[in-house]
């Protein structure tokens, strides 16, 4: 396996747009609303050790950092890493450049976030990432995936296919889903009990 699995030129061109924010994370209400909904579906108020795979310029990461005692933010693009480092000036946040699945850490996490990046992967690479998730989610952990549900050009997978594969291959309890008109948002947990049950309400 080589680093050709990452389309360097595509993302290098993309991050030249809008000062490194080609999706306008900071300008669009759509993006702000989606971040708020992603944070709202997290089943626990705090996490010991989180990872965001494909952190981009760190806009979502900054809000995840408020929920994590330690947060690892990973992206393959050097411009994204530079921008994320400028934004995430917290002692408990680490930003690293790396390619999925080659550079994934071999440690457990109780929060794994993949937002708007899995459809960039070839299916065999996605399956390797899922295998990693099945190995390194801690017993009290959760996985959150959020992806655009409309057409995507130039890649072999779309958001719907990604979430179907996740549902088929993840070994965890499918805790909740939110099917917005524009995106899929799904959560898996290690614990099969609902939050109400965990807090003694049931």
Regions found by a protein language model. Name each.
Residues 1-45, 49-105, 121-135, 141-202:
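Class I (Rossmann-like) S-adenosyl-L-methionine-dependent methyltransferase catalytic domain
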Residues 104-112:
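A short acidic, Gly/Pro-enriched loop at the edge of an enzyme's catalytic core
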Residues 114-117:
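A short beta-strand submotif of the Rossmann-like class I SAM-dependent methyltransferase core
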């Amino acid at each position: 396996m080589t680093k050709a699995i990452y389309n360097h030129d595509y993302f290098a061109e993309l991050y030249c747009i809008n000062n490194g924010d080609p999706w306008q994370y900071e300008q669009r209400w759509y993006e702000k609303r989606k971040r708020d909904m992603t944070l709202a579906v997290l089943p626990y108020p705090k996490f010991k050790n989180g990872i965001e795979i494909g952190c981009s310029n760190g806009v979502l990461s900054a809000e995840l950092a408020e929920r994590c005692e330690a947060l690892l933010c990973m992206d393959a693009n050097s411009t994204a890493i530079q921008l994320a480092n400028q934004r995430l000036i917290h002692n408990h946040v680490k930003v690293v450049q790396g390619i999925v699945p080659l550079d994934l850490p071999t440690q457990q996490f109780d929060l794994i976030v993949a937002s708007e990046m899995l459809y960039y992967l070839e299916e065999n690479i996605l399956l390797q990432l899922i295998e990693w998730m099945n190995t390194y989610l801690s017993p009290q952990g959760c996985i959150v995936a959020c992806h655009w549900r409309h057409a995507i050009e130039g890649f072999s997978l779309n958001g719907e296919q990604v979430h179907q594969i996740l549902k088929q291959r993840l070994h965890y309890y499918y805790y909740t889903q939110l099917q917005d008109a524009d995106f899929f948002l799904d959560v898996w947990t290690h614990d099969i009990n609902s939050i109400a049950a965990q807090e003694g309400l049931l």
